[in-house]
Every structure is written in structure tokens, then in C-alpha cells.
Design a protein with these regions (language model features):
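Prokaryote-biased recognition of long, low-complexity C-terminal linker/tail segments
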Residues: 143-199
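Intrinsically disordered, low-complexity regulatory segments
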Residues: 1-140, 144, 170
Length: 199
């Protein structure tokens, strides 16, 4: 049966995440002084990371939280994407919802019906994916620290907003280098060799 934000049937409640429902809090949540961008306040390095429910996904988060807290729900199955980000997305929702119920992992490499049935028949303990979750946390926090601190630093130095990121800035640099190489290209004569063989 389709309900608002989930499906129910055969002893299961099935719901979904819409991207990252829970995200790292902005600097001003840690301290109001960070509302104003100042080089004197850099670097911003949280001692205890804080998370907020994304404004655009509050409704779906609320649905997930209620489902997790239902008294007839004994355990949770993490069926998010099989990868680092899927692990992070689920666990942040689970933690932010204050859920303490046991959870297992459905790991799929195919969306075919047989593969899904096989996956449910062999659910994995959540602890098998702790390292994947920790890797995702490291990536997320590194992105935040580089993005927040470098963007604020270079925006202050430049005098207007300038976005800097762990991935986007090196890619932009490679694009600029390639564009400069194309602009500086000078055509040169070249020769090809033809070889005619006779038996």
C-alpha cells in the first residue's frame, strides 16, 4: 500500500532518502561570529561536528523518523546505494532521528528481482560497513574544511565571493591550463611515412 513517503506491505515498511537529508551545519551554528567572513577567524575547525536536517528534505526526514520510531518496527535495513555515500546518507538519518534499533545492510549490485531477493536473504551486519562509513565521514568533513576555509580566505583576499573546493578547484585549474595550451598552439608541419612492400 502506498502511503505518504513510504510503502507498506508483507511485513515491511519501505521508504527512501532524497539525496543527503542530513548535512553538516554551517560555521555560524558553531559560533555567531562566523556569520561575518573574516580572515582573523580562520581556520574554522569544529571540535564536535554538528548536523542539520536539510531544509528541502524536512518532510521526508520526518517521515523516516516516525517510521523508525514506530513500536511495530523491530529493526531497520539500510538499502541506500551500495557505496560510500549510500552508507553515509543512511547513517546520518539514523543518528539524527535518534534511532537505537538494530540495523543491517542490504548490499546490491543489481536491481533485478532475483538479486534483490538474494540480497534480502543474506543481509549483512551493519558493522561490516563501518570502515566505509568512516571513509565517507572523512571525505565529507575534508570537503567542508577545505571549502569553508579556502572559500572564505580567498573571498576576503579577492574582495568578492569566490568558491573554492577540494575537487572543483583542481579541475578548474586543469581546465585553465588546457585552455591556455589551446590558445598558445602554433601549428607546425609534420610528415607521415608511407611504406610500400612488395613480395
Amino acid at each position: 500500500n502506498r502511503q505518504d513517503g513510504y510503502l507498506e506491505g508483507n511485513g515491511y515498511l519501505v521508504s527512501w532518502c532524497v539525496g543527503h537529508l542530513v548535512e553538516l551545519a554551517p560555521p555560524n551554528v558553531y559560533d555567531a561570529k562566523y556569520v561575518k567572513w573574516s580572515i582573523a577567524d580562520l581556520p574554522t575547525l569544529p571540535q564536535k561536528w554538528q548536523y542539520l536536517v536539510s531544509a528541502s528534505t524536512k518532510k521526508q526526514f520526518g517521515i523516516l523518523q516516525k517510521l523508525m520510531q514506530r513500536p511495530d518496527v523491530d529493526s531497520i535495513v539500510n538499502s541506500c546505494d551500495s557505496g560510500r555515500e549510500g552508507e553515509l546518507i543512511f547513517r546520518l538519518v539514523y543518528q539524527q532521528a535518534g534511532c537505537k534499533k538494530p540495523f543491517s545492510r542490504l548490499w546490491l549490485s543489481s536491481m533485478e528481482e532475483n538479486a534483490i531477493r538474494e540480497g534480502f536473504a543474506h543481509l549483512k551486519p551493519s558493522t561490516e560497513y563501518d570502515a566505509l562509513y568512516n571513509a565517507a565521514l572523512c571525505r565529507e568533513r575534508a570537503d567542508w574544511m577545505v571549502g569553508i576555509n579556502a572559500s572564505r580566505l580567498f573571498s576576503c583576499l579577492y574582495g568578492q565571493p569566490l568558491a573554492v573546493g577540494r575537487v572543483m578547484t583542481p579541475v578548474l585549474a586543469m581546465t585553465v591550463v588546457r585552455e591556455a595550451a589551446i590558445a598558445a598552439f602554433v601549428p607546425e608541419k609534420f610528415y607521415t611515412v608511407d611504406l610500400e612492400l612488395t613480395s
